Amino acid sequence: MGLDQEDLDLTNDDHFIDKEKLSAPIKSTADKFQLVPEFLKVRGLVKQHLDSFNYFINVGIHKIVKANSRITSTVDPSIYLRFKKVRVGEPSIINVNTVENINPHMCRLADMTYAAPIFVNIEYVHGSHGNKAKSAKDNVIIGRMPIMLRSCRCVLHGKDEEELARLGECPLDPGGYFIIKGTEKVLLIQEQLSKNRIIIDSDKKGNINASVTSSTEMTKSKTVIQMEKEKIYLFLHRFVKKIPIIIVLKAMGMESDQEIVQMVGRDPRFSASLLPSIEECVSEGVNTQKQALDYLEAKVKKISYGTPPEKDGRALSILRDLFLAHVPVPDNNFRQKCFYVGVMLRRMIEAMLNKDAMDDKDYVGNKRLELSGQLISLLFEDLFKTMLSEAIKNVDHILNKPIRASRFDFSQCLNKDSRYSISLGLERTLSTGNFDIKRFRMHRKGMTQVLTRLSFIGSMGFITKISPQFEKSRKVSGPRSLQPSQWGMLCPCDTPEGESCGLVKNLALMTHVTTDEEEGPLVAMCYKLGVTDLEVLSAEELHTPDSFLVILNGLILGKHSRPQYFANSLRRLRRAGKIGEFVSVFTNEKQHCVYVASDVGRVCRPLVIADKGISRVKQHHMKELQDGVRTFDDFIRDGLIEYLDVNEENNALIALYESDGTTELDEGAEAAKADTTHIEIEPFTILGVVAGLIPYPHHNQSPRNTYQCAMGKQAMGNIAYNQLNRMDTLLYLLVYPQRPLLTTRTIELVGYDKLGAGQNATVAVMSFSGYDIEDAIVMNKSSLDRGFGRCIVMKKIVAMSQKYDNCTADRILIPQRTGPDAEKMQILDDDGLATPGEIIRPNDIYINKQVPVDTVTKFTSALSDSQYRPAREYFKGPEGETQVVDRVALCSDKKGQLCIKYIIRHTRRPELGDKFSSRHGQKGVCGIIIQQEDFPFSELGICPDLIMNPHGFPSRMTVGKMIELLGSKAGVSCGRFHYGSAFGERSGHADKVETISATLVEKGFSYSGKDLLYSGISGEPVEAYIFMGPIYYQKLKHMVLDKMHARGSGPRVMMTRQPTEGKSKNGGLRVGEMERDCLIAYGASMLIYERLMISSDPFEVQVCRACGLLGYYNYKLKKAVCTTCKNGDNIATMKLPYACKLLFQELQSMNVVPRLKLTEA
């Protein structure tokens, strides 16, 4: 059926078609946000710790036990023990005869370690020399493994909110930490240079070197090839000194100089660079493999404690097992190693000719992050091997004694002390944080830290913290600066100030850290895709210009003539789910290499795949996600989203928004759009958890965001739903925490809106009284009365009731209700312990305890009253402050001692000098508290809670704070939470200022957020419009009550006789160098004399006028004597600070003699 001419005209008519609609993207990108919470369900934040630990429990521990599965006696080789299977059980504790399951909350309260037994099934030979018999035992416990909370072996794994509440656990608590002896410990993420990769660098003298840190299951070694004075040498710790590299190549069987030159490259510049090294080799008289091996043999370090000499010579075995240890040597065929050295030499000479070819050690692609699973795996392997060697020693010891050998049972030797060694080793390392693994010469300190529970967000930030392997003392800017490669992987804001600035980093919101993938299938896949094996290549063919080397995890597999096709094929396979989702493929045009990586510890993040700039994720996919029929893993499986690591990002062109490039229709933008390979899921995910709390951070000056990251961790609020059941040493809680009126997407994702740490305060920005200079805040007394900024401080006190070896024990007595101590005991209950709910004052007794006088002598009968002495414990607190006994808990520790824990509660209202801060790094102390009657008020009768000085804005440039005030004001007036996510205006995750202003005008306020205020003192209108509205303020943990301190006289230090330091020791306040300079400038000489000597450490000395040295006063002769002149004729007495006298004597001990010249005053 044909159309009429008229209809045809209509269809051809341009007005009929909405061209804009056709050219617009399928649907705006604002809807992709839903992917972020879906991603956080399966990956990211704390999940990397859990994934890593789960990998160790499910895979790593089996590999370790399998690798060391059989141990044989050295005395009788037919006696052996074999491990068949290993598994980690449920967390439990062994009471006298029963096994009791435990949960994390119990462990926190009772100071236990949250650990599970490690079971093994064993097969072994037992019996005497004559009749040996095979036997098998199942479920033998070899030790206890501390369990990470929320991991696959944890009680909390997979539980819903109701079940978690039943176990006394907070559903918002992220897990990812261990409980060791009742304290929560986090194994920090460790940052390291990647293993098995060639890194080209230069030393201080400018010598170029190529280094490879090889790491295999068996050995870890570092190989350095360095160029010195145009000659190239190898440095390896087993050789005495540097060794010419050509000799090493000849020792590995590459005898022909021509082949060596071909292998590095035919370019004349390359051969010219190698010439001095080849000449040196000839001058040493080394031409054949045998001569080279003999030369190396002489250079091997002699090891005093002896491994027996290998049959094929030590030099060859070092080259095989330690030199580039990760490159395999099948049947003593060193060809692969030679080629590897060739590639290293080529890269070095390229770097020498062109400095751009050097590697950057701070580039994130050259870094690996070590997570808890890997660290515990190293530790467990070390302890397991120690246990096996101990078992063999025990067996040999028994077999050498014929009487005991007849009743011999191998499995008994395993149980003897071994299970304690593994349990204790793991517990001690996690408790102290000191990793000492002797086999790999690994000694690191501070690997674990106590999880600080100051605020909910503080503990979240703590778990995503990355600890550097770099000395903080070195003042280098390189590793500290913000690298472009950190985009999207590490948070650009969240780093501490001070010495560790830029070294300690935090993960961004959508970063994932990879775990290990199997290499075997990948290798096979590469060969199937047309990689030519190294074995069949000649040295000449290694660097043909049109083909690239293929390197998998630092191993050279071979060459490929169509590298781009190879890389794209691997990517297609990855998107189809045929190879692991975290495998990365990266072509490096400069180095003519294709790198394939599947190793552990790379940082990667998910991105939406785009075809010619158009996103693969369409509206219907997001609809399915919202309906719950599609998960994040489905997006990956269907090839809509993929994970890219830092190296592969270099091959991609990533757009922030799908519409990028379409706004300007010039040719450049169109071309860029056509080349776009990926689109960001959400731009605000480049920030971490802590920086995500800041509203409108992209409107603030950068260091302000960094300051807020540090202060947000110190803000008081709620720490968890179970906070009132916890027994923490110190707990700060806000009485009325609120949700921020101006919120961000991150706040909702993390759960900060449920456990906030601050309050929405109505702030007027104006000068008021003189008490608001330098960021101080003027506070409204009525607001404080209504509970603004009020907080609770809870402290734990522990008392022990001990049992002693001589069958005696402490006893707790009924308190005296009359008598001299009755007043101090009035808070005690009839059981001799403080009653919950009682008000406790300083010097009150909280436990009426008595201790046996003699705890050594054995007693058979009960002790009489006279054999006990009182050991009451008194409460120490700030004078004049009353506190409340909140809870009393009784529990027993490992040794069965009774442990009594008290929680003391103290409610504090804000006072002068307490520290507050907004979410924009603007901290200030309370300068004065003023009655509400004197405060200014608006025409609606609104009175501000705080008054802030306007001078805080110009130099700080925190425009985000101004927008927050407007947004919160609009939110209050229209009853909707407004959003201020980073970079969110374009995607709808941040309200624009225009729309906020429009809302304000609609609700009857000024569009600029300013109000007409009346003075509370005179009642007249204030002569300027005042910027007023709600801002979210945080109360920080720094409070005057904890810091305020002064003293008259008090304790002194023995050595210098000066007052001690610090509030806890009742110390003095030091007049330091700057204060001294200030007093000198004033010319207040008597004050200097009084402060620095009379009130500090005056000391009377006898000085000899003849020699100027110190003498002493002889009390027998009743006169002063000079030790040097041996008489007392010419001695004067004077006052010196004791520290000065000490300095003189210390100098004299170093042969420096200070002499005092005296004149009459």
Swiss-Prot record:
Q: Which UniProt keywords apply?
A: DNA-directed RNA polymerase, Metal-binding, Nucleotidyltransferase, Nucleus, Transcription, Transferase, Zinc, Zinc-finger
UniProt GO cellular component terms: DNA-directed RNA polymerase complex; mitochondrion; nucleus; plastid
Subcellular localization = Nucleus
Kindly list the residue ranges recorded as spanning the membrane. Answer: none
Name listed for the protein in its UniProt record: DNA-directed RNA polymerase III subunit 2
**Zinc fingers (C4-type): which spans?**
1104-1125
How is this protein organized at the quaternary level? Component of the RNA polymerase III (Pol III) complex consisting of 17 subunits.
Record function comment:
DNA-dependent RNA polymerase catalyzes the transcription of DNA into RNA using the four ribonucleoside triphosphates as substrates. Second largest core component of RNA polymerase III which synthesizes small RNAs, such as 5S rRNA and tRNAs. Proposed to contribute to the polymerase catalytic activity and forms the polymerase active center together with the largest subunit. Pol III is composed of mobile elements and NRPC2 is part of the core element with the central large cleft and probably a clamp element that moves to open and close the cleft. Essential for the completion of the three rounds of mitosis in female megaspores required for the development of mature gametophytes.
EC number assigned by the record: 2.7.7.6
Catalytic activity reads: RNA(n) + a ribonucleoside 5'-triphosphate = RNA(n+1) + diphosphate
